[in-house]
Amino acid sequence: MVGWKADPAILKEFNPKMLFWGGGHKPHGSDFLVTAVESSNFQIPALEKMEFFVQMQSTMTPTTEYADIILPARDWMWEEKNVVNGGGGYGGFQAINYCAGVVPPAGEVRSYVWVFTKLAEKLGVDPKTYFKYYTTDENWDQDWERYQQDNYQMVTDYYAKRNIEVPSWEEFSHGKFINCDELDAEPFTGFDDQIKGGKPFRTQSGKIEFFSRYVADEANRGKGEHFDRSGRLIDNLAGDWGSLTPHAVYRKAVKGMDDPRTRQYPLMVMAPHARYRVHYLFWEQPWLRNHVYQHRVWISPADAVTRGGIKDGDLVLVYNERGKLVMPAYVTGRLMPGLIVIRHGGKYMPDANGVDFGASASTIMGGDFESCITPAHATTLVQLEKYQGEAP
């Protein structure tokens, strides 16, 4: 297996023949033509180089359409049963709840974890090494529930140490959820042990450090895995970190307004997440399309006037060297001139000439590999004009 942390020398000789794209256990995580960091038009030739492409999905996505074999997967929200901890990292309240599923799995459809467990077995690996709760295929649902119960037990143990009672597993799995914020006498703040209690940070100085001694040491470059001085994995550092410096420095944005390419592509694109989707997920939901949410490119009145008097609802062509897309315009004074907005997660729907009429922001994104930590997938430079053709 070769990934982004691999020795660069391996990658130069890497010539893959087969791709199994599972994308984890969440459906929106495996539509990579829309959600990955490279342009859709540049990913497709890479897919077509594969002699064999297997895609595991719960919905038919643009990526899935390129697969040689499609394996149906249980949907993690509607068909699986999962303990979910979420909310806090996305600006909401921190909560722990149980997704019990709302429909039974169709036919013999299996979960991602079952498939990976069986793959491990076929490769000669003890399946319990991958999923320790596994006993037999017939007992899979019971094995999975034991796994979820153990996950929840960690929650109850955590609160028991603080003398806080939480719902039993039986109550929790039948609808009660935990609002973590309500269980704390005071709002949660990070690093209380260090800042309020005087406990040293796990750094060389024991204080917050703004300089990475690890990155400064060139002997560490090229390793497959990186660990800090206390043995913790640095899981977001690539094998070769390129021009990354050990301390923060200002750099001009790649494909930003300081880029000389603005002479050819004078508009900067922002691609925020839509309120009505999770990445690509829910694009196919008619209740959230047209009536509630309309997938349009936002453009300022000043930029609309200088481009032939573009009006609300006019079809426009957005393009750069990465690709072309066509979508309706939304003219609004909420944007400054020189900036347009296309929401992330639109469906990639190219015509015979490669023009994307689903208007996925990924079509025009990509090509920025300056940062090995966070390849930018939120901004780029484009030109925009009235579309003169007909929609397919």
Where do the language-model regions lie?
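Short beta-alpha connecting loops at secondary-structure transitions
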Residues: W78-V84, Q94-P105
